[in-house]
Amino acid sequence: MNVKIRKPWGMYEVLLDEPDYKVKKIYVRPYKRFSLQYHNHREEHWNIVEGIGTITQDDKSTTIRAGEYAYIPIKQIHRLEGGYKGITFIEIQRGICKEDDIVRLEDDFGRDTDKKVSHQ
């Protein structure tokens, strides 16, 4: 059984961890959101499996729901917020998939941010 990692915004579970890719099941609680962030060494593919939420990619925010897909290229600023029932998605990371490859620009939970870093 995989371990569920609790976060202030929800939780995730690593389903598969290989040298060049990782697969996670992620749940974002209702009206919570993870950091506005980007990654220097990995891209992400999100397949929404349950719920509805708001995805931000660069400066554009849109509604995303079960059955939809989002691609997050390397260095793209992004964030996801859960809707009224939260949102669950399968995330496939490709590249160097380390948990410390997160550059936070904004965070609702007081975690360190780095607004001075260029993501270009």
Question: What is the role of each PLM region?
Answer:
Residues D58-I77:
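Short acidic-glycine-tyrosine-enriched beta hairpin
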Residues N2-K7, R79-Q120:
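Double-stranded beta-helix
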Residues S35-L36, I55-Q57, E91:
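Short hydrophobic/aromatic-rich beta-strand segments that constitute the beta-sheet cores
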Residues P30-K32, H41-R42, K60, Q76, ...:
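A generic "binding-loop/recognition-motif" signal
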